């Protein structure tokens, strides 16, 4: 809700990257992009980067269509999912958006460790399935911290896949009520 992740992603993305953030207006963590937030978040872009802010439910077909228009046929190199923390919600975000990721690209999920008070929702349950289904998973966990954590999935490379090339360094966030 505060834009910290968007700022950090803009700092590490390619100079020409397109960064797209999807956020549900009025979500449980104050989501959406008010005019003042839009000005601030767009100022995160550096060099020739472009930041697109989409107010919408990541599960709505119209939201996905808006993303596709902005991508204009380009694949996503890095997809960060930190939205609907229900099992069904995070699974749907993964199923709807991971097919848009380039071969050799990465998908990152936030809050993959079960929190004793339930703060991380059920992302951890879906992460356990992904660890079984994908050989290239990696958990990034802070020792001694309950819950949270990042789960990284490296998608298999195809014959045309390359490392985060500048001509297609696209980042997206399917973040329902939590992020940006």
What name fits each language-model region?
Residues 1-180:
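S-adenosylmethionine/decaboxylated-SAM
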């Amino acid at each position: 809700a505060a834009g910290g992740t968007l700022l950090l992603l803009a700092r590490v993305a390619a100079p020409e990257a397109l960064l797209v953030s999807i956020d549900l207006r009025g979500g449980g963590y104050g989501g959406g992009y008010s005019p003042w937030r839009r000005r601030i978040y767009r100022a995160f872009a550096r060099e020739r980067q472009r930041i697109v802010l989409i107010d919408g439910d990541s599960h709505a077909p119209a939201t996905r269509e808006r993303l596709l228009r902005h991508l204009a046929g380009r694949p996503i190199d890095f997809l960060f999912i930190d939205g609907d923390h229900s099992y069904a919600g995070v699974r749907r975000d993964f199923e709807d958006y991971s097919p848009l990721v380039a071969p050799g690209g990465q998908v990152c999920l936030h809050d993959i460790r079960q929190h004793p008070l339930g703060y991380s929702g059920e992302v951890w349950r879906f992460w356990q399935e992904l660890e079984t289904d994908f050989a290239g998973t990696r958990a990034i966990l802070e020792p001694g911290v309950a819950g949270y954590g990042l789960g990284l999935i490296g998608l298999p490379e195809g014959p045309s896949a390359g490392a985060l090339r500048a001509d297609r360094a696209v980042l997206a966030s399917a973040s329902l009520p939590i992020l940006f």
